Amino acid sequence: QSEEVFLVHVRDRIIPLRRDAIAYLYTANEKVTACTFEGEVYPMDRTLEAYQSQLPEHDFFRANRQFIVARRAVKEIAVWFGSRLTLHLAVNTPERIVISKARVPEFKAWLRAVRPAE
């Protein structure tokens, strides 16, 4: 079951973060952050694995150990060394997003997939 809205705790406030506003989720130093299409960055309180299970697979892809990316955020794909791919998103990212050679076919199939009827 995927969540439509995540409640994000920022200091003494709780901010409702809509799933469709998320461009990517990123983990570094055991902390997960979400970046919106407007470039806002929010601290999240679960692991990347937990969010992966809460986000619809059709709309979000686990690119690597650090990133889950939204389909709408992918603007360009570049072929990189060793048959890997790098993703360029609609928003800036803290580091290069690399898709491993082994995951390239899965990523391409995901990107080509037609949205299932709801």
Question: Where are the predicted features?
Answer:
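Conserved binding/recognition cores within well-folded domains
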Residues: Q1-V98
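Eukaryotic intrinsically disordered, low-complexity regulatory linkers and tails enriched in Ser/Thr/Pro
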Residues: Q1-R11, K101-E118
